[in-house]
């Protein structure tokens, strides 16, 4: 995860705690969770649209009957 170790994550969490205070942390976590959920949803929608567009552009193989030699 971004090349961060345990000590770096603890340091970042302590800085966030000092900046925003203990009372704001649940609100920040909730907002972060919602943001991540919306981002993941948008990412999935874009992937679905891309895959659909690629499927639509792929030429369909037509069946002309039995093979003749």
Curated annotation (Swiss-Prot):
- Please give the start and end residues of each transmembrane region: 1-21
User: Is the Transmembrane helix keyword given for this protein?
Assistant: yes
- The set of disulfide-linked cysteines is none
Q: Which Gene3D superfamilies match?
A: 1.20.5.3310
Its annotated compartments are: Cell inner membrane
Annotated region (Disordered) at 49-69
**GO CC annotation terms, alphabetical:** TAT protein transport complex
The domain of life is Bacteria
**GO molecular function, one example?**
protein transmembrane transporter activity
Keyword Translocase recorded: no
- Topology within the bilayer: Single-pass membrane protein
What InterPro entries does this protein's entry cite? TatA/B/E, TatA/E
GO BP terms: namely:
protein transport by the Tat complex
Sorted alphabetically, which keywords does the UniProt record give? Cell inner membrane, Cell membrane, Membrane, Protein transport, Translocation, Transmembrane, Transmembrane helix, Transport
Q: How does it assemble?
A: Forms a complex with TatC.
State the HAMAP family in the record.
TatA_E (MF_00236)
Q: What does this protein do?
A: Part of the twin-arginine translocation (Tat) system that transports large folded proteins containing a characteristic twin-arginine motif in their signal peptide across membranes. TatA could form the protein-conducting channel of the Tat system.
Q: What's this protein's family per the entry?
A: Belongs to the TatA/E family.
Q: What is this protein called?
A: Sec-independent protein translocase protein TatA
Q: What species was this sequence derived from?
A: Chlorobium luteolum (strain DSM 273 / BCRC 81028 / 2530) (Pelodictyon luteolum)
């Amino acid at each position: 995860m971004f090349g961060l170790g345990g000590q770096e994550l603890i340091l970042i969490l302590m800085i966030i705690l000092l900046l925003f205070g203990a009372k704001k942390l649940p609100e920040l976590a909730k907002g972060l969770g919602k943001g991540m959920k919306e981002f993941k949803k948008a990412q999935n929608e874009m992937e679905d649209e891309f895959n659909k567009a690629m499927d639509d552009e792929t030429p369909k193989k037509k069946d002309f009957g039995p093979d003749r030699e």
